[in-house]
Amino acid sequence: MADHPAVPDDASGDDSGSGLPPEIEQLIARLTGGPVDPELAKAFKDMGIDRVDPAMVEMVAGQMQAMFSGPDEGPVNVTLATDTARKTVSQAGDSVVSEGARRQVAEAAHVAGLWLDEVTIFASAGTITHAWSRAEWVEGTMPAWRTLVEPVAQGVGAAIGGAMRAQIQQLGEGALPEGMLPAGADPAALLGQLEPMLERMSGSMFGLQVGQAVGALAAETVSGTEVGLPLVADRSVALLPANVEAFAEGLGIDLDQVRLYFAVREAARVRLFAEVPWIGPQLLAAVRDYAGAITIDTDRIETALQSVDPTDVEALQSALQGQLFRPEPSPGQRAALTRLETYLALVEGWVDVVADRATRGHLPQSDALGEAVRRRRATGGPAEKTFAGLVGLELRPRRLRDAANLWAALESAQGQEGRDRAWGHPDVAPTAADLDDPLGYVERAGGAGESEALDAAIDELLRGEAPGDGDGR
């Protein structure tokens, strides 16, 4: 190569013999895990990539380098998701939490714990409290988001790969547009070489979407687990002072009361997740069951991409958002969604009832605050809509009021102990059918208790003991 008197214009300084611009060749080599295959290079050249304006090549390469920089992180590029979420909250406005605000949150959490001790059998999960900025909430909850979203990302990636392979199997060289591939090229072999790049692209695009969704949620959520999911790993009570203040604006309620009310709700939710260890895995299992049946609507994707500049990564991501899922879920997915929504409703319904009992005698505006929370959930917001479009799941429980009625009825019949013991095992916890008939569930739960007492008495008699005298004396 050194003997050549000049570098051809279409080689853009390339000395590898591929004829591709060096920026593009280096990028393809890194994404495919080795030297660029000559057949693949020729396919790109036949598409005209070597004749693209150098400035455009540099811009596209820069975008791709940013998207694929760093190690392969699997189905979701969490580094990209975290960076995107932090940029989102920074653009919306975020500030460092003052020491005064941290003390106020710690004091509110302490008082909330004392009030909850009076109304639930679930013990405090600990004394750790956090007063988080929006960026700190992103950092603190991103590991849980990864665990939640990865099954969906895997399902999407597998469905996309399967759809592409199925289409290529139906195509021969003659079925592709003229000049798309070099003569004699095997489309399936080329796809095999591109699969590592497609997997990283899928992980990066999903990371970008997760980051935007979590960033939008960080601008609205008032506490660590307000969405009804166990997002905080250390079982701490976390509030976002800036978002609590934003919620309080226009309510005409003292900020101290608002802070205390949300501290009670968050502390109650943290106790529930700590004392009911099966609820978190059940939520995740429902997401996995949903994700395992994901199918890709390739026709909708093709329609969405027809008017998009393929070099514009953000436009590409925007076009795909909401287009990856078929309009109608499969029966298996509907069952998974029903389970997920039921558990979320049960969690938030229980929190509603317990928070009401804990604050009723202490906060003058307790009822007004409860109604404000219900209005906020009923109307929804951009965060809920963003995440629903991202993974096809509705994170806001649709049947919250039914769940709250069920817990209140159970408490009325059996007291707070009976209410809380209904969480003892997923097999005895209320179901979607029970939300349709709360009073029927309460009657059945009461009957089960009487039956257990009768069985215990009979067992004692068979052992020759007096009923109620467990030691036989």
Give, region by region, the residue ranges found by the protein language model.
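N-terminal low-structure segments adjacent to metalloprotease catalytic domains
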Residues: 1-157, 415-473
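Pan-zinc metallopeptidase signature
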Residues: 328-473
